[in-house]
Amino acid sequence: MWPAQLLSQLLPLWPLLLLPLSLPAQGSSHRSPPAPARPPCVRGGPSAPRHVCVWERAPPPSRSPRVPRSRRQVLPGTAPPATPSGFEEGPPSSQYPWAIVWGPTVSREDGGDPNSVNPGFLPLDYGFAAPHGLATPHPNSDSMRDDGDGLILGETPATLRPFLFGGRGEGVDPQLYVTITISIIIVLVATGIIFKFCWDRSQKRRRPSGQQGALRQEESQQPLTDLSPAGVTVLGAFGDSPTPTPDHEEPRGGPRPGMPQPKGAPAFQLNR
């Protein structure tokens, strides 16, 4: 019984099993046709020492019909465009931010205005100020002179004058001279203050050294004996206590006659 039940359950699943088999068959129909097989190897001739295989070269792959926009064919009768390829619609700002678009140039013979065709640039007959006051034409102008050797010589443009040595009537701001004068005065005053400070400091250093030298000289000239009205005392070697001199010592026998002896004062003894 169970095989019959199993077959009855598997019968509805047969279409699902046939579905994957039909998909590869449909996909194979869309594939490109297989490449032609190469011809077999043929013998070149009876005189050839060995078999030579001649193969036919396959044709090169066909290129896509797409052509880049920048590459355009130029007909033999037409002139190439004035602007570079790819710039007909204007230079892109993201790809070439540093590109400069030059305008057309018109010569004087054609009757064009050189100032209008070259905006932002100096005119062709622009003159420079010369040191002696004359106007020097531009080297590219028609007023150039020709020397005997056939060389075209033009006067070189004069360099700009320094503003400090030029005339005051040439449009220099007078405030500039006032600023320079005040700056010079400030520098001179600051230099004088610094010099005065250094001089006072050097004098203060010399005074203490002079005083110390005077004190040392006085100490060297001071005598070893001390002259006093009471008597002459000699400074001892081991102390400052005065020692009586032999001239003021009393005689051994006693006081001299005629000398008043103080009351209550004991007699001076030699052997203390």
From Swiss-Prot:
Keyword list, A-Z: Glycoprotein, Membrane, Signal, Transmembrane, Transmembrane helix
Residues annotated as glycosylated: T136
GO term, biological process aspect, one: gene expression
Location(s) in or outside the cell: Membrane
Residue ranges annotated as Extracellular topological domain: 28-174
Post-translational modification: O-glycosylation at Thr-136 is essential for recognition by PILRA.
Residues in compartment: Cytoplasmic: 196-272
InterPro entries, sorted: AJAP1_PANP_C (IPR029198), PIANP (IPR039628)
PANTHER family: PILR ALPHA-ASSOCIATED NEURAL PROTEIN (PTHR32023:SF2)
Signal peptide coordinates: 1-27
Record membrane topology: Single-pass type I membrane protein
Species of origin: Rattus norvegicus
Residue ranges crossing the lipid bilayer per the database entry: 175-195
Positions of region (Disordered): 25-93, 205-272
Biased composition (Polar residues): 209-225
Protein's recorded name: PILR alpha-associated neural protein
Principal cellular location given in the protein's record: membrane
Gene Ontology molecular function: protein domain specific binding
The protein's role, per its UniProt record: Acts as a ligand for PILRA in neuronal tissues, where it may be involved in immune regulation.
Gene Ontology annotations for the cellular component aspect, listed alphabetically: basolateral plasma membrane; membrane; presynapse
Domain of life: Eukaryota
